[in-house]
Amino acid sequence: MWHRALGPGWKLLLALALTSLQGARGAEEEPSSDGSFQVVTFKWHHVQDPYIIALWILVASLAKIVFHLSHKVTSIVPESALLIVLGLVLGGIVWAADHIASFTLTPTLFFFYLLPPIVLDAGYFMPNRLFFGNLGTILLYAVIGTIWNAATTGLSLYGVFLSGLMGELKIGLLDFLLFGSLIAAVDPVAVLAVFEEVHVNEVLFIIVFGESLLNDAVTVVLYNVFESFVTLGGDAVTGVDCVKGIVSFFVVSLGGTLVGVIFAFLLSLVTRFTKHVRIIEPGFVFVISYLSYLTSEMLSLSSILAITFCGICCQKYVKANISEQSATTVRYTMKMLASGAETIIFMFLGISAVNPDIWTWNTAFVLLTLVFISVYRAIGVVLQTWILNRYRMVQLETIDQVVMSYGGLRGAVAYALVVLLDEKKVKEKNLFVSTTLIVVFFTVIFQGLTIKPLVQWLKVKRSEHREPKLNEKLHGRAFDHILSAIEDISGQIGHNYLRDKWSNFDRKFLSKVLMRRSAQKSRDRILNVFHELNLKDAISYVAEGERRGSLAFIRSPSTDNMVNVDFNTPRPSTVEASVSYFLRENVSAVCLDMQSLEQRRRSIRDTEDMVTHHTLQQYLYKPRQEYKHLYSRHELTPNEDEKQDKEIFHRTMRKRLESFKSAKLGINQNKKAAKLYKRERAQKRRNSSIPNGKLPMENLAHNYTIKEKDLELSEHEEATNYEEISGGIEFLASVTQDVASDSGAGIDNPVFSPDEDLDPSILSRVPPWLSPGETVVPSQRARVQIPNSPSNFRRLTPFRLSNKSVDSFLQADGHEEQLQPAAPESTHM
């Protein structure tokens, strides 16, 4: 199976090797000297580099497909380990074909092209609250823990070397400390690759992953300091140089963070003004973020910290400013680049190892390095956790400490740093490279294989991938305010106090500068919750009737149609429905001309088609159709779903505001609606050409359109957009013939429109399929008991602290029910 599965990859690699040989042999060949015209010429040297890059990307992508063909393999072996093994196999094939290590993971390729998309993806999708809530813990592990691991590993190896167990090596104390500094850092790429498959709880994951990101500053400083000391020589190092090394740590870390924040501010500001160039919005996100990385490298600062904090700080404002299509493009492109870069890194780690020229073996040095990095990692975690648990509210248990100690994975960062060493200054560079590769393979393959069974055996709390309920959000928000108030009253400055102050500062200053005004309104918490409740209630209101079988009764817009609903007719059984559905699916001819269908003699199926057609046309939004738009490089087709959501929201908001106003001022909406209905009816009699001045009552349907003139919009663009949605037509409750109309105003659905005041005798009809305990279905009960509009639903009422509270809204509604006349009244807004 594996031979067949890897066949395409081997064929591509063999073709790559053969073409490389042919290109090497024929690169210097002169063109034909006979002077004749050649129809086809072979120019391998002309496309060699991009062709090889494309082939390697294709091989890496095919490898991911092959690995995931068998879920059993990927559930046991991490994908990073499989990629390293694949790299070893491919590297062996390339070496056997050419005996030259043609393809290796170079530091330039890694640091400038493969690492930035991975770190940007991690920063842009970082859970900010979880990250900053554990920032103190992360910084302690990243700074103190990395220094501890580097110093103890280097000094321990130097002590063993002095004992003579390693034999004769041309290494000094500074060389051992240099090696300890590059091998001590936890690699973010390896941690992401392994821990995302384990699915540990969020706190444990953010601590280990945050440590792997933030220890870059410590690693870079230690590496540069000890490399400079090795260049100067141990005798030339003074105390001033040590002080400069300590100062450089703060400059590198804080400087890289500041560069990232500045570019995040610039990116957020740019995306605020991209309303008319939506198509290039994703380009700004990637280019400006990458510039933050390059700028930090240019200034010798921490580039990983720069691009990480650029993604962390800009995500809130960028997501609010850019369009939905651009946000989707950014999300998928960023994930694609990060996944592809991670795949190439691990595969090239395996390929780079197949090079006999870099291998120098020393058993004592290699084995003791593995022992020391594991032991000192565990000791450092235990000591630091003991200190942290004295101040943390949620303490880290022993099981969490075991996983953190075992999760100290090394990866391509250590390999790239060791390859950068100058062989003239570090005599045993090949020994360091060989040991680093062994450490990377051991941590990624062995620890990656065993960490998942270890987590299951220790019963570590796993992450829950679900959306928190509204009740959980409400209580979490309330607890945040309570804890912030307690800290404020007691005079203590804690996480909740700082978070509350930052939220106020962001709302008053940053959001006004970096975010569009329309985005500020749309991000309002109350309106977001209101919008979610509105959509949920609308969906459940319709679905409730469908489950009960009373959808036709609920959606019937006129009195006559409601009278014509025969509840005594038995409903078809499940078998009949399935047979009917089967026959309908296999019918070849379907009549789509609804006008001719209505005029001719109708069968049962034709009647059903006609009713379904009119129901969908009148009460639901138009389904998506394939429009043929002209090609444009600068514009995208607007998403109709956004208009639908906005229209539902604004229409329901207006009805609830009117309900609130009427309840507060004691205005009887029925009397007001009766006057409006009489005035409209008189106007219709005067203007209509219908004989005797009477309106026909057959097939009546209420058509509603609305123009939101009174809606206060802050910007011209919002008013323009909304006029496009609503159609800009004055609202009139009119009675027209039941024709297949296509109103540009949006929905004309009684579910979202005001209820019709109907004859009580009609509303009192009870469907026969209900049990004695249920007089009417819940959705029908909502129509009958509440006379005015859906805004009187208990869940759709204006915001209250409790469903059980008896406020002015319920009292006003109950008073109106008592005063409602028996005669039906007009439809009103």
From Swiss-Prot:
A GO MF label? identical protein binding
List the residue ranges of the region (Disordered).
677-696
Q: Which SUPFAM superfamilies match?
A: Probable bacterial effector-binding domain
Keywords assigned by UniProt? Antiport, Cell membrane, Endosome, Ion transport, Membrane, Phosphoprotein, Signal, Sodium, Sodium transport, Transmembrane, Transmembrane helix, Transport
Q: What controls its activity?
A: Seems to switch between active and inactive modes in response to various stimuli. Activated directly or indirectly by membrane phosphatidylinositol (PIs). Regulated by a variety of auxiliary proteins, which facilitate the maturation, cell surface expression and function of the transporter. Inhibited specifically by the drug tenapanor.
Q: How does it sit in the membrane?
A: Multi-pass membrane protein
Q: Where is this region: Interaction with EZR?
A: 571-585
**Which residues does the record list as Phosphoserine (modified residue)?**
S550, S558, S588, S603, S659, S714, S805, S808
> Topological domain, Cytoplasmic: which ranges?
70-77, 125-127, 199-200, 275-276, 319-325, 385-397, 463-829
Q: Which GO terms describe its biological process?
A: regulation of pH; sodium ion import across plasma membrane; sodium ion transport
Q: Where in the cell is it found?
A: Apical cell membrane; Cell membrane; Recycling endosome membrane; Early endosome membrane
Please write the reaction equations for the catalytic activity of this protein.
Na(+)(in) + H(+)(out) = Na(+)(out) + H(+)(in)
- How does inactivating the gene affect the organism? Deficient mice have diarrhea associated with proximal tubular acidosis and hypotension. Males are infertile.
Please give the record's comment on domains: The C-terminal intracellular domain is subject to extensive post-translational modifications and binding partner interactions which regulate transporter activity, scaffolding functions, downstream events and localization.
Listed under subunit, the entry gives: Homodimer. Found in the forms of complex and dynamic macromolecular complexes. Binds NHERF1 and NHERF2. Interacts with CHP1; this interaction increases trafficking and activity of SLC9A3 at the plasma membrane. Interacts with CHP2 and SHANK2. Interacts with PDZK1 (via C-terminal PDZ domain). Interacts with NHERF4 and interactions decrease in response to elevated calcium ion levels. Interacts with AHCYL1; the interaction is required for SLC9A3 activity. Interacts with EZR; interaction targets SLC9A3 to the apical membrane.
Q: What does this protein do?
A: Plasma membrane Na(+)/H(+) antiporter. Exchanges intracellular H(+) ions for extracellular Na(+) in 1:1 stoichiometry, playing a key role in salt and fluid absorption and pH homeostasis. Major apical Na(+)/H(+) exchanger in kidney and intestine playing an important role in renal and intestine Na(+) absorption and blood pressure regulation.
Listed name of the protein: Sodium/hydrogen exchanger 3
Organism for this UniProt entry: Mus musculus (Mouse)
What is the primary gene name for this protein? Slc9a3
